[in-house]
Amino acid sequence: YEMSASLVGSEMCIRDRNLMNVVIAIDSFKGSMTSMQAGLSAATGIKRVYKDAHITVRPLADGGEGTVDALVNGCDGRMTQVQVTGPSGHPVVCPYGIVDETHTAIIEMSGAAGITQVSGEEKNPLNTTTYGVGEVIKDAIQNGCRHFIVGIGGSATNDGGVGMLQALGFGFLDKNGNQIRFGAKGLEDLESITTDHVLPELKECTFRIACDVSNPLCGEQGCSAIYGPQKGATSTMILQMDKWLAYYAALAREQFPHADAKYPGAG
């Protein structure tokens, strides 16, 4: 980045010695550099060539890692955090943003159910859960938030958001009336969905999803087939999860007519 930025800086000097304002906004590089690290590195390169440049570095994100930082920075929000259930069932501390003026929470799914939070044998979408995401939403509601922006990139999960909804009071029950197990494997036992104990404040809430893909829930372009391998799924797991998610989607649509597994981005 410093080398490329130096070249850019040199070109700017040649074109116009008075051009001193530079805005840098670079998305993060998974597993290597955050958005701000990349931006500051580029800024260092520019400064080496054009010492008088006025440089503004801003975080940028696509719905995955860095989304909270980018939006909180741009919306004059503040950061808070809460301990929740991580993707493998162990506690994790999830930071999220709050914009008090609009009662809006900005949440990264990757902060509570992220692929970087699992390793080795824990990297298995049959077992990983989104329960912690629901716990973050619940905490934000208790902090007065009624509007939510949720970035869904970078997750370690493939449970169709069931864990998240369980944390918010939805019942996903097996044939014996018990909550199904965490992870995609729990969907194999799903028989019914109940709403008797749903958090009542959810009726007052709005949700917007930050996402840069258009995959449907199931099929050759669905979440299991496209994103399952990077989450640790084998070819057998992919077929199983796709089948279970299709049944889950059909069951959900019976109760919630607007639920559409083919909606772009549902996967």
Set out the residue ranges of the language-model regions.
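N-terminal loops that bind phosphate or other acidic moieties
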Residues: N18-I152, A156-G267
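Single conserved hydrophobic/aromatic residue that forms the stacking wall/gate
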Residues: Y1-D16
